C-alpha cells in the first residue's frame, strides 16, 4: 500500500515541509547560498520528520485491523484530536480502502476547537470514498472531567480565535463546549474498540492524559499517537503514565530546540518541530474485540 496515490501526496507534502524547514534553519537562509547549503540539504534525506512517525502509526493501525479475525463484526475506528481538515482521518481511510477494501466498516471522529472547520471536514469526507456518513466532526475542547476554570475559559477563547485565523475559516463567534474524553466517546457512541487515538492538541496532551484516562484507554484503545509540545521533563512523565499501565512505547522523541542539533533516530538525524510519543496497548486486538462482543453496552 506504500505505492498508492494517496501516499504519494503525503510524501510530496513531507518533502516540501522538510525542505522548507531546512532552508529556514540556515543562517542567512536561501538556496543560493552555495555549496555549504546544498551539502546541508543533501544530508537531510530521506525525508523524515515527526509526521513520518504519525504515518507509520496510522498504517500500522490499518494493518493490524486487517489481520483481526473479528473485523467483520466491528468497524475500524480512529479518533483524531486536533484534526484540522482531518488529514490523518483521510490518510487512515485511504489505507483502509487499499488494504481491506472500500466495503470495510469504519467510524471516524475528528475533534477541533475551531467550529468553522466543520464544513471543510464534511467536504473532505464527500471527496473520499468511504468517509461520507462515517465521519463526524466535533467542535470542542477536551479537559479532565469536562470542567475548566474561568481563567482557562478565557484562554480557550483566545486559542479558538487564533486557530480560526490559522485555518482561514469564518469565525461565527461560537463558544465551543468542553467535555472529558469519556464524555466525548459516549456523546458520539463510539465502538468499544478504537484502533487509533491520534492527538495533536498544542500542549493540552499533558492535562488530557491523566492516570484515570490512561486506565480507561487500556480497556478499549489499541494504539495512541501523541504529538507533544512540551519541554524537558514533560514527555517522560507522560510516557511513564502509559508504561505504568504496561503500554509499550513504540516511538519517543522530544521536540527539537531551535538552536539545538537534530536528534538521532534509527532513520538518521531528525529535527522535530513537535515531539512524538507512540504507545501500543498490551491487550491484543482479539482480546479487546472479544470483550466488545460480550459487552451489551458501550464501554464508555
PLM regions: where:
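Phosphate/nucleotide-binding beta-alpha loop and adjacent structural elements of enzyme active sites
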Residues: 1-300
Amino acid at each position: 500500500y506504500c505505492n498508492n496515490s494517496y501516499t504519494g501526496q503525503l510524501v510530496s507534502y513531507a518533502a516540501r515541509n522538510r525542505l522548507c524547514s531546512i532552508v529556514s534553519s540556515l543562517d542567512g537562509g536561501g538556496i543560493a547560498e552555495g555549496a555549504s547549503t546544498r551539502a546541508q540539504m543533501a544530508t537531510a534525506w530521506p525525508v523524515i520528520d515527526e509526521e513520518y512517525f504519525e504515518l507509520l502509526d496510522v498504517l500500522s493501525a490499518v494493518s493490524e485491523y486487517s489481520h483481526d479475525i473479528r473485523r467483520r463484526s466491528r468497524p475500524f475506528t480512529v479518533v483524531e484530536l486536533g484534526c484540522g481538515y482531518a488529514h490523518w482521518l483521510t490518510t487512515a481511510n485511504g489505507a483502509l480502502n487499499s488494504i481491506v477494501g472500500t466495503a470495510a466498516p469504519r467510524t471516524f471522529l475528528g475533534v477541533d476547537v475551531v467550529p468553522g472547520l466543520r464544513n471543510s471536514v464534511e467536504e473532505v469526507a464527500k471527496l473520499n470514498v468511504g468517509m461520507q456518513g462515517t465521519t463526524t466532526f466535533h467542535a470542542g475542547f477536551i479537559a479532565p472531567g469536562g470542567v475548566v476554570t474561568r481563567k482557562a475559559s478565557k484562554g480557550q477563547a483566545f486559542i479558538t480565535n487564533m486557530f480560526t485565523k490559522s485555518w482561514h475559516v469564518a469565525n461565527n463567534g461560537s463558544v465551543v463546549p468542553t467535555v472529558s474524553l469519556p464524555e466525548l466517546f459516549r456523546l458520539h457512541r463510539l465502538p468499544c474498540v478504537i484502533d487509533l487515538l491520534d492527538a495533536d492538541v498544542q500542549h493540552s496532551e499533558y492535562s488530557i492524559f491523566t492516570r484515570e484516562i490512561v486506565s480507561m484507554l487500556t480497556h478499549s484503545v489499541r494504539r495512541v499517537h501523541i504529538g507533544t509540545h512540551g519541554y524537558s521533563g514533560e514527555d517522560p512523565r507522560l510516557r511513564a503514565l502509559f508504561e505504568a499501565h504496561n503500554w509499550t512505547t513504540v516511538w519517543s522523541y522530544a521536540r527539537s530546540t531551535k538552536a539545538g542539533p537534530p536528534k538521532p533516530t534509527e532513520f538518521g538525524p531528525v529535527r522535530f518541530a513537535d515531539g512524538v510519543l507512540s504507545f501500543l496497548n498490551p491487550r491484543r486486538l482479539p482480546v479487546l474485540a472479544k470483550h466488545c462482543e460480550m459487552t451489551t453496552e458501550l464501554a464508555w
